A protein has these predicted regions:
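Extracytoplasmic/luminal low-complexity segments enriched in Pro/Gly and acidic/polar residues
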Residues: 160-278
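Short edge beta-strands and adjacent turn/loop segments
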Residues: 8-32, 103-111, 176-199
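Long, acidic/polar, low-complexity amphipathic helices and coiled-coil-like
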Residues: 25-30, 40-156
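Structural beta->alpha junctions
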Residues: 35-39
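Short loop/turn motifs enriched for small/polar and acidic residues
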Residues: 19, 66-72, 233-235
Length: 278
């Protein structure tokens, strides 16, 4: 097996480990590192053909195999087995951009982790035309640290998130609320399959809670036609459960006063002021 893998043109190095089991089949772990800057075609060929050959050579039902490579300054890891691995790997190579630090292709998702920066790059959100979003069978996620705040994007096939003003929302967060803040945009949330924006901030005490940060974020997305829900979370370090204020949206307009309304109404009123997101 080592000889076969090492003989492939695109392969730089191979490591094979066998873990004997007393009453079960032996467990095989295979790490394959490709030569730098491989083409999409060569990656797809190794991922598809090499895994099938390794299964044949070991006689095992399953082999844990990791194919890794570096493209520019981006490290990519493909974990096998997975369905349509060659298509996923090929599409990922096409989607790579210089700002990406680490990319992982796994059984159910492709995750793109970006280098820390002070401002969100323009056109950060992957468009529906991206090869990875046309796959359909895998979740596609993007994550980046913007200064002291985290930003996550979770995609779904057929959902275009590019119109959601995530960059503007991040920039409107008051400086004293940016440390540890999280802004998450989901094409489909787990329960209701709605396009949802979640903003989470930290306060030292519930007494420090104010509507300014929440209103600023909400104001940036008023009028957006894609979002169906906005959730604003506030956490105190000593408390396990954050406080949540939710807003359902339809055609860019908030429906009702928020949930709970006694918390939502003042946030919505502040968000609707002309200078709320500036």
């Amino acid at each position: 097996m080592h000889q076969y893998l090492s003989g492939l043109d695109a392969v730089a190095s191979v490591r094979v480990e066998v873990h004997p089991e007393f009453s079960e089949p032996d467990r095989w772990t295979v790490d394959v590192r490709l030569k730098d800057d491989p083409s999409a075609e060569s990656v797809a060929t190794v991922v598809r053909d090499a895994y099938a050959k390794v299964l044949n050579l070991t006689g095992a039902n399953e082999v844990r195999m990791v194919v890794s490579w570096v493209k520019g300054k981006t490290s990519v890891f493909c974990y096998l087995p997975m369905k349509d691995a060659d298509k996923a790997a090929s599409a990922t190579v096409e989607a790579l951009s210089p700002g990406m630090e680490r990319v992982q292709i796994e059984e159910e998702r492709i995750s793109f982790e970006y280098r820390t920066t002070e401002t969100l790059p323009d056109h950060f959100i992957l468009p529906p035309s991206s090869a990875v979003l046309r796959l359909g069978s895998l979740r596609v996620e993007q994550s980046i640290l913007i200064g002291r705040s985290h930003c996550f994007i979770s995609h779904a096939k057929g959902k275009d998130l590019t119109s959601v003003p995530v960059k503007r929302a991040l920039e409107t967060i008051p400086s004293d609320k940016r440390y540890g803040a999280v802004l998450s945009l989901e094409a489909e949330d787990y329960n209701s399959h709605q396009a949802r924006l979640i903003f989470k901030k930290w306060v030292n005490d519930w007494q420090d809670e104010d509507v300014q940060a929440d209103a600023a974020v909400l104001a940036t997305v008023l009028g957006n036609q894609v979002l169906q829900r906005v959730e604003l979370l506030t956490s105190v370090e000593s408390k396990v459960q954050p406080r949540v204020v939710g807003f359902d949206m339809k055609s860019g307009t908030v429906v009702g006063q928020g949930d709970p309304p006694e918390k939502g109404a003042p946030i919505l009123a502040a968000a609707q002021q002309p200078d709320a997101s500036s």
